[in-house]
Amino acid sequence: MKRTFIMVLDSFGIGASEDAAKFGDQGSDTLGHIAEVCARGEANVGRQGPLTLPNLSRLGLGKAAEESTGTFPQGLDRNADIIGAYAHASELSSGKDTPSGHWEIAGVPVLFDWGYFSDEHNSFPQELLDKLVERANLPGYLGNCHSSGTVILDQLGEEHMKTGKPIFYTSADSVFQIACHEETFGLDRLYELCEIAREELTEGGYNIGRVIARPFLGDKPGNFQRTGNRHDLAVEPPAPTVLKKLVDEKGGEVVSIGKIADIYANVGITKKVKATGIDALFDATLIEMEKAGDNTIVFTNFVDFDSSYGHRRDVAGYAAALELFDRRLPELLKLVKDEDIIIFTADHGCDPTWPGTDHTREHIPVLVYGPKVKPGSLGHRETFADIGQTVASYFGVSPMDYGKSMF
């Protein structure tokens, strides 16, 4: 029985890529810098002391990071008994965004340039805004700028609730984000507005990767909170991913946990499981791993590392989340059976010590475990697509156009 489990620790980079300078990210290192801050005793909010990741260390995380940067992360166990194969991988795709990283993991790098709304103020074309107001019968809009999603709620949340005007904003990523209050504006109405925005962006040729619904609750600045009802409307991958090939060629199953289905525009997904928060995502993953049959991929995105800690530049929060993940890791590993493989990886970096609030162009860890996987270094992988090619080879589907199998 062949099963693969892919766990994406969203934004968990392990050192700047060779081309990081082109993105202004030379020297970024999500894991390494978190470890440094923890070792200095400067991340003792909700946790204490050096970064402690014994189970990820046994899978080779520290070794992979050392091969990436030349420096072993502070606090991790250099003498851990390595039980998995490990590597660091560079991104071939032109961007450092979520869809590019995930599509490349599944064997389809993004070699075209996404469209972006690069102006920090008055970010969106007036023609687009006018169409959204008209088609969705809106009283107007707020924002129209670059912003952190939490900051803009404190700035405009009250006005949004009073006026019914949705909050439109973007970032350095190829995104059009819409924040609305679940109760005063309505969740279904927000989703409908996002569908309209997706249509207009596609028909207008803007080449924007995602429209993201950002629902929130609360009644005043300081207590506005984004809810777990986020929804991403992505464009479809430009070629068949290994997920789609498994479904089409083998009649296989691909179980999405968290936002995976949204990222792939539901293409190559046979089951969707919604969960919010690291513990809930972990619990859902355990349930689906136990139920998984032959020719199945269970694919989970742990988004909180990125959305709650990376973008918010919260080192202590990121460290605590990593330590929580690590504590629960044995629960996953004990469900891995004879022919199974489980892969722990990331889709980009988001160094919480880095200037700004955006992603960072970094190597990702590739940690592979299974009873038949030989422990040791798999070296430097030139593309995330090596993961997809490895999975394609494992299941015996037609090869991907990019990447080399790691085994």
UniProtKB/Swiss-Prot annotation:
CDD domains: PPM (cd16009). It comes from the Bacteria. Its EC number is 5.4.2.7. It catalyses: 2-deoxy-alpha-D-ribose 1-phosphate = 2-deoxy-D-ribose 5-phosphate; alpha-D-ribose 1-phosphate = D-ribose 5-phosphate. Pfam families: Metalloenzyme. Its cofactor is Mn(2+). The keyword Manganese applies. InterPro entries: Alkaline_phosphatase_core_sf, DeoB, Metalloenzyme, Phosphopentomutase_DeoB_cap_sf. It is found in: Cytoplasm. GO terms for biological process: 2-deoxyribose 1-phosphate catabolic process; 5-phosphoribose 1-diphosphate biosynthetic process; metabolic compound salvage; nucleotide metabolic process. One of its GO terms (cellular component) is cytosol. Pathway: Carbohydrate degradation; 2-deoxy-D-ribose 1-phosphate degradation; D-glyceraldehyde 3-phosphate and acetaldehyde from 2-deoxy-alpha-D-ribose 1-phosphate: step 1/2. Mn(2+) 1 binds at residues 10, 347-348. Binds 2 manganese ions. One of its GO terms (molecular function) is phosphopentomutase activity. Keywords: Cytoplasm, Isomerase, Manganese, Metal-binding. This is Phosphopentomutase. It comes from Serratia proteamaculans (strain 568).
